[in-house]
Regions:
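Short, acidic loop-to-helix structural element flanking the phosphoryl-transfer center
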Residues: 77-78, 95-132, 142
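An amphipathic alpha-helix signature
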Residues: 38, 53, 57, 77, ...
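Active-site neighborhood of HAD-like aspartate-dependent phosphohydrolases
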Residues: 17-61
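A metal-dependent, Asp-based hydrolase signature
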Residues: 44, 64-101
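Asp-based, Mg2+/Mn2+-dependent phosphohydrolase catalytic module
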Residues: 3, 8, 121, 133, ...
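Non-catalytic pre-domain segments flanking phosphatase-related domains
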Residues: 1-25
Length: 242
């Protein structure tokens, strides 16, 4: 698809035609590369770096869903650590306290995707209001934003921690309209996670799916309003709707 944007069928006319006034970004996988932790994992466990990063992310997300459905909240930091412990057990790795600490600390300084900083600066220069809306708890988000040199670009770091649940619970998505004092269709919700884009679309956002991996759309009876391959494609989408 490249820079061409796919406006999808099956959305409300309001979401399709709304003037965009703000953007809410998912953090992990969208702004920050969760698989970049695999580089350190490879050094600590040679030959296992990719497997660790893949399974760790899978369990991290699975645990947020299970805890949200069951009302058993733990912070995203704790859930991330639990996912790492499971991953080590599943792969038969000796996860010492020092290695666990090193990998967890790396999660606070994940690599940003290469185009992201320039895109964020472009949007800010266009007068677009921006915030992060994430499963991450506040200390994690603050550390990641600082490490990625994104400080000063966002009005707010909106965390699920205040409602003690996780995406795709509707209460989480309500943070965007509540913060910006805008209707959901006036806000572009940006995520690289197809399930997150689906949840935000159900809520009523104008959704933009950053489909970096070229995955098919989740089969949930709903599609994101638009799709691009990188965050660079978002700029064109927002410009056309301001």
């Amino acid at each position: 698809m490249g820079a061409a944007l796919a406006a999808s069928a099956g959305h409300s006319a309001l979401a399709q035609g709304a003037k965009i006034k703000a953007v809410a970004f998912d953090a992990y996988g969208t702004l920050f590369d969760v698989y970049s932790v695999g580089q350190l994992a490879e050094k600590l466990f040679p030959g296992q770096g990719n497997a660790i990063s893949q399974l760790w992310r899978t369990k991290q997300i699975e645990y947020t869903w299970l805890r949200a459905m069951s009302g058993q909240y733990r912070t995203f930091w704790e859930v991330t650590e639990d996912g790492l412990v499971f991953t080590a057990q599943r792969l038969g790795l000796d996860l010492t306290d020092d290695k666990k600490r090193a990998l967890m600390e790396q999660y606070n300084k994940l690599d940003p995707f290469p185009e992201n900083l320039e895109v964020l600066k472009q949007l800010k220069g266009m007068g677009v209001r921006m915030a992060i809306l994430s499963n991450g708890n506040p200390p994690m988000l603050e550390a990641a934003v600082k490490s990625a040199r994104m400080e000063g670009l966002f009005e707010a770091l909106l965390s699920v921690d205040s409602v003690k649940s996780f995406k795709t619970v509707p209460e989480v998505y309500r943070f965007g309209p509540d913060h910006f004092k805008l209707s959901a269709p006036e806000i572009v919700f940006v995520s690289s996670n197809g399930w997150d884009a689906a949840g935000a679309t159900w809520f009523g956002y104008t959704t933009f799916w950053v489909n970096r991996a070229g995955n098919p759309t989740e089969v949930l009876g709903v599609r994101p309003v638009a799709e691009g391959k990188t965050l660079t494609d978002l700029v064109e989408f927002v410009k056309a709707r301001m």
